A protein has these predicted regions:
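Cysteine-nucleophile amide-bond enzymes
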Residues: 20-212
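Bacterial Sec-dependent N-terminal signal peptides
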Residues: 1-27
Length: 212
């Protein structure tokens, strides 16, 4: 074997070794895990992310609840297209055929016992329309409201006063002004609510990593 060939083989071996030791391990999802989608290119997605930043500096605009069934992994969530519904994991990871970054979080051990009841509550909310006003409601739900309510009986997550103001300017972005003008209601500034970035910042959760 020539010296040059030996160098090539050594390089390939070291490259493979480095890749194996530094790649993120495959995540095995469990029922009760939360999947957070990073913001998309849609205006509302960007607007949600912009006004809901936390100290964790996450950029999430959607969240869903994992359930592992006998036939596969599904995600229970509320979205504008289908309201409160159940979709396959693949459909959640590739909305409208696109690929988005999805980060998995898991409840810490002390809170794992709340999951069965939360899954049951989530199923009871199936079929309700999407809550486009983002004002808490019993008849319609937005994504983080859906997750909050699923765990509400065990007080896993908490509500915070909502803000729709740009933290850099203190003013309402044009996107939100136009959004609520079309709905014919005032911007619900200060009303209790929740958002994906706020849920992800909970000290009851631990980050698992990116779903491949």
């Amino acid at each position: 074997m020539s010296y040059k060939l030996k160098l090539i083989l050594l390089f390939l071996f070291l490259a493979g070794l480095f890749s194996c030791t530094h790649s993120e391990p495959q995540i095995k999802l469990q029922s009760g895990d939360l999947l957070f989608r990073e913001k998309s290119s849609e205006n509302i997605s960007k607007a949600i992310d912009k006004v809901t930043q936390t100290f964790g500096a996450t950029h999430f605009s959607h969240v869903g609840l994992v359930e592992v069934t006998d036939t596969g992994i599904v995600v229970l969530h509320a979205n504008p297209e289908g309201g409160s519904c159940i979709v396959s994991l693949n459909e959640f990871l590739h909305p409208k055929g696109d690929s988005v970054t999805v980060i998995a979080y898991r409840l810490k051990e002390d809170w794992q016992k709340t999951i069965p009841a939360a899954i049951q509550k989530a199923h009871q909310m199936m079929g309700k329309p999407y809550n486009f006003s983002y004002i808490l409601s019993d008849t319609a739900h937005y994504c983080s409201e859906f997750v909050y309510l699923a765990f509400a009986d065990d007080s896993v997550f908490k509500l915070e006063p909502m803000t729709f103001k740009d933290p850099a300017t203190g003013n309402f972005p044009a996107t939100w002004v136009e959004y609520y003008q079309k709905m014919g209601i005032e911007i619900p500034e200060g009303k209790p609510g929740c958002n994906p970035n706020g849920l992800a910042a909970s000290n009851k959760l631990e980050r698992l990593g990116i779903i491949k």
